[in-house]
C-alpha cells in the first residue's frame, strides 16, 4: 500500500476543529487591527484636506455643479461613455485574420535547417490553415 492514502479517523476531527476556530479568531483580530489602522490614517493625513472635510461635514456637491466656469471645461457625463463611431480605433480588428507577412517566424531550432522549398511551402500552408489565414 502507498503512503498517500487517508482514512477517516473520528478522533482527529475534534483537533482540527479547534485549530480552525483558533485561526478564525486570529484572522478576526488581524482584520480589526487593519480597520483600526485605516481609521487612524484618515484622521492624520487625509483629514486635513478640504475635500475630506467637505465629505465629513456633508457638504452638498451642488455648489460645484452650479459653478459654470468649472463645469464648462468638461463634457457632460453621459457623453463620456457613449460609443463614438466616428473615431478611428487604432487597435487590431479581431474579425479579420492577420496577414501572413505579419505572422512571427518559428524559432530556428523548431525547423530543420535542410528544408527543401517544397517542404517550407507545405509547412507554411499548414500553418496558414491552422491559423485560418487566407493568403
Swiss-Prot record:
A motif (SH3-binding) lies at residues 95-101. Its main location: nucleus. It is found in: Nucleus; Cytoplasm, P-body. Residues 75-103 are annotated as: Disordered. GO terms for cellular component: nucleus; P-body. One of its GO terms (biological process) is nuclear-transcribed mRNA catabolic process, nonsense-mediated decay. Pfam families: PNRC. InterPro entries: PNRC-like_rgn, PNRC1/2. Keywords: Activator, Cytoplasm, Nonsense-mediated mRNA decay, Nucleus, Transcription, Transcription regulation. Residues 75-89 have a biased composition (Polar residues). Involved in nonsense-mediated mRNA decay (NMD) by acting as a bridge between the mRNA decapping complex and the NMD machinery. May act by targeting the NMD machinery to the P-body and recruiting the decapping machinery to aberrant mRNAs. Required for upf1/rent1 localization to the P-body. Also acts as a nuclear receptor coactivator. Belongs to the PNRC family. PNRC2 subfamily. This is Proline-rich nuclear receptor coactivator 2 B. It comes from Xenopus laevis (African clawed frog). The gene is pnrc2-b.
